[in-house]
Amino acid sequence: MEIANTQAAIPTIDISALLSPTASEQSRQTVINNMSDACHAYGFFNLVGHDIPPEAMRDALDCNKLFFALPQDRKMEVSIDKSIGRSFRGYEPPGIQTHHEGLLPDTKETFMVGREVMEGDPDCGSFSTGPNLWPSDLHKKGFQDRVMSYQARMLRLVETILDCLALGLPKSWNCTSHVFKPLLNKPSIPMRFLHYGPVEIHDDRQFGVADHTDFGFVSILLQEAGTSGLEVFYPPTKSWVPVPVFEQGFVINMGDMMQKHRHSVAFFLNGDLKLNAKALDGSGHETIVGEQIQQRLIETMGMTGNLLRRELV
């Protein structure tokens, strides 16, 4: 049985040198090396020194709380089953997702927002592509504009992260510094507002969200200060490492993760869903981005997975 390792800690990386026009080349290279090392060792790191204003981070969490404070019937008015086609926008109540056989469904509830694609677009209604659903109760609070403003900030931040990751790839792979740019072509960028309510019945099979790997390329997680629960599995010691919450920090995820009331906002870069992603190391492995993500959803999502399974048969 794996246990929590309170001695180890995932790295914290300050990327301010990447954003400063006066930073030395050595300082920039240190950030690149540190990020590359963190991805190899953990697949996770804390990120600080970014240019996201503290008030924007607080506002994202405030929007999270505004939505989940709505009565259940008002949240269900923007239920994910009302989204167009297979766009999967809107509210998911607790009990939708099960990550492993033998576990109970996750207790989390989510509100999903993505890239805004209107009904006239030829791709509207295809997988993870379509218009967002917005609760009318929060219109006067500027909810939609506030959420989309935060999403735009996350897209700019993930571009900075991708550029840094590209510069950290092995020189023998002969990759350019813009090798990840195709991911940002009409990208799938689901952003999930998450609420983990208190677990009233204690059961070893019950989690807010069980251990899993994220489906896409890069995830940016904003956690509420003063909370805990997220852990990273560290294979060398076969132990779970707690992820601390930094007041002005984000958790960046490339790999495995395991997640009182707790709120968080997760931004996922899945990339261009039509892109044929090829392994950069020359191994020949390749996959269509959208097909890979759909298969993972079928494996773990109840209502959403069943819908995808029917449409793919």
UniProtKB/Swiss-Prot annotation:
Fe2OG dioxygenase domain location? 187-284
Any idea which positions bind 2-oxoglutarate? K274
Effect of disrupting the coding gene: Abolishes the production of eupenifeldin.
Is the Metal-binding keyword given for this protein?
A: yes
What pathway is it annotated to?
A: Secondary metabolite biosynthesis; terpenoid biosynthesis
Q: What is its EC number?
A: 1.14.11.-
Tell whether Ribosomal protein is among the UniProt keywords.
no
Cofactor(s) needed for function: Fe(2+)
Q: How is the cofactor bound?
A: Binds 1 Fe(2+) ion per subunit.
First-level EC class: oxidoreductase
One example GO MF annotation? metal ion binding
Read off the Gene3D superfamilies from this record. Answer: B-lactam Antibiotic, Isopenicillin N Synthase, Chain
Could you say which residues bind Fe cation here?
A: H212, D214, H263
UniProt keyword list: Dioxygenase, Iron, Metal-binding, Oxidoreductase
| A GO BP annotation | terpenoid biosynthetic process
Q: What does this protein do?
A: 2-oxoglutarate-dependent dioxygenase; part of the gene cluster that mediates the biosynthesis of eupenifeldin, a bistropolone meroterpenoid that acts as an antitumor agent. The first step of eupenifeldin biosynthesis is the biosynthesis of 3-methylorcinaldehyde performed by the non-reducing polyketide synthase eupA. Oxidative dearomatization of 3-methylorcinaldehyde likely catalyzed by the FAD-dependent monooxygenase eupB is followed by oxidative ring expansion by the 2-oxoglutarate-dependent dioxygenase eupC to provide the first tropolone metabolite, tropolone stipitaldehyde.
Q: Which family does it belong to?
A: Belongs to the iron/ascorbate-dependent oxidoreductase family.
| This protein's name | 2-oxoglutarate-dependent dioxygenase eupC
Organism this protein belongs to: Phoma sp
Print the organism lineage: Eukaryota, Fungi, Dikarya, Ascomycota, Pezizomycotina
